[in-house]
Design a protein with these regions (language model features):
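Structural microenvironment flanking redox-active thiols in thiol-disulfide oxidoreductases
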Residues: 42-90
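Short active-site neighborhood of thiol/selenol oxidoreductases, capturing the structured segment around
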Residues: 18-48, 54, 58
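A short, polar/charged loop-to-alpha-helix boundary motif
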Residues: 151-166
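Residue-level signal for short, function-critical loop segments
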Residues: 34-35, 61, 139, 148
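Thiol/selenol-based redox catalytic cores and closely related redox-interacting motifs
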Residues: 82-152
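A generic fold-level signal
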Residues: 13, 23-24, 128
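N-terminal "domain-start" segment that seeds a small globular fold
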Residues: 1-20, 42
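Short loop/turn microsegments at loop-to-beta-strand junctions
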Residues: 3-4, 28, 130-132
Length: 167
């Protein structure tokens, strides 16, 4: 699979070719669910350690919402605002079924995160959309793809670190 040749809008409002992010070095592209997703907030907390790595986060918020969320969550990475889910669609990310979004196991996982200090936020975006992570090589080849199997299926910081080390 090749990364799409497309222009994206950043949290700053600036537009940029997606290929500019992987030109010369691999890119880890992380697609988040909605801003209130406790599992995404857990993943963001783990991604904060990678301040200098080439990681870009994609969300469904409008530019100002994305910028505000980035500040509130202290996200060091660049964020792409994709309220129409065009980039989600280009990477074949899909909406989850009822069982992938709501079930007893996910409820228990959410409670555990709440007890651990993570917080739910306001729902902004499609609550049924599942997340994903992709590694894009400098030639545009997508060498790794992770499609979430449910709303809690996000790559850990350790898994992201391994992706960064791939040659």
């Amino acid at each position: 699979m090749q990364a799409p040749l497309t222009v994206v809008t950043l949290d700053s409002g600036e537009t940029k070719d997606l290929k500019d992010f992987y030109n010369g070095k691999p890119l880890i592209l992380v697609f988040l669910r909605h801003f209130g997703c406790i599992f995404c907030r857990e993943q963001i907390a783990e991604l904060r350690q990678f301040k200098t790595e080439n990681i870009v986060l994609v969300c469904m918020g409008r530019v100002q919402e994305t910028s505000d969320f980035k500040k509130k969550m202290e996200i060091p990475q660049t964020m792409i605002s994709d309220p129409n889910k065009l980039l989600y669609e280009a990477f074949s990310l899909r909406r989850g079924s009822f069982g992938q979004v709501i079930n007893p196991t996910l409820t228990r996982k959410s409670i555990k995160l709440l007890k651990g200090g993570h917080k739910l936020g306001i729902l902004k975006g499609d609550p049924w959309m599942l997340a994903g992570v992709f590694r894009i090589e400098p030639d545009g080849d997508v060498s790794y793809s992770h499609y979430a199997t449910d709303v809690s299926d996000n790559l850990s910081g350790a898994a992201i670190a391994q992706l960064l080390k791939l040659k």
